[in-house]
Design a protein with these regions (language model features):
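ATP-binding/phosphotransfer module of carbohydrate and carboxylate kinases, centering on a glycine-rich
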Residues: 3-14, 27-37, 59, 74-178
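Short glycine-aspartate micro-motif
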Residues: 16, 40-44, 50-52, 83, ...
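A cytosolic small-molecule/anion-sensing beta-strand core signal
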Residues: 19, 55-56
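A gly/ser-rich beta-alpha-beta helix-loop segment of oxidoreductase catalytic cores
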Residues: 33, 47, 55
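Conserved hydrophobic/aromatic beta-strand scaffold that supports enzyme active sites
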Residues: 42, 72-74
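Structural signature of FAD isoalloxazine-binding scaffolds in flavoprotein oxidoreductases
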Residues: 66-69
């Protein structure tokens, strides 16, 4: 019904409704780094972690149009809680939300152990002010605790990417988001 209503507002032009990661995967396959690739995967990083899979030029959606929920593959059994209700999902570690939580944990551990971190000053001692940029900014300034955060984040991201490559064997894998 939404597509039809939008189409009517746009003088009958065709309107398609698509999940953001699938739309990004289509865009990469149509005009981006995956142009001409038979098999490609797009990983979208943001508040969550999404995925779009292109097989033979078409988006893979699964039987219920919910295929490619890559962020909800488990990479840490019994790990961090995820917004989906499960534990250990890739999204809980490699999304911006996951990065914020990893950063908060490292700051809390630094407090307990007496380690100094410039991230404390950046957030004014208020963990609710941690952002996805906090650790990267502090790491660039030479903060060791922040470097540990970034290493952990990248390790989980790489683990998930390796899983995607091993499962799908894409010609092209792209990562984007906002």
């Amino acid at each position: 019904p939404i597509a039809a209503k939008l189409s009517a507002l746009l003088d009958g032009k065709k309107v398609y409704i698509e999940n953001d990661a699938n739309a990004a995967a289509k865009a990469e396959a149509f005009a981006g780094v995956a142009k001409g690739a038979k098999y490609s995967v797009m990983i979208t990083l943001g508040t969550g972690l999404g995925g779009g899979i292109i097989i033979d030029g078409k988006v893979y959606s699964g039987f219920n149009f919910a295929g490619a929920e890559l962020g909800h593959t488990v990479i840490e059994k019994g790990g961090r809680p995820c917004t989906c209700g499960r534990h250990g999902c890739w999204e809980a570690y490699s999304s911006a939300t996951g990065l914020v939580n990893i950063t908060k944990d490292h700051i809390a551990q630094a407090r307990k152990s007496g380690r100094k971190t410039s991230m404390e000053e950046m957030i004014g001692g208020d963990l609710s002010k941690v952002s996805a940029r906090t650790a990267f900014t502090a790491m660039k300034a030479g903060d060791e605790v922040a470097a540990e955060v970034v290493d952990e984040y990248i390790s989980y991201l790489a683990c998930g990417v390796a899983n995607v490559i091993n499962i799908f064997q894409p010609n092209v894998l792209s990562i984007g988001g906002g």
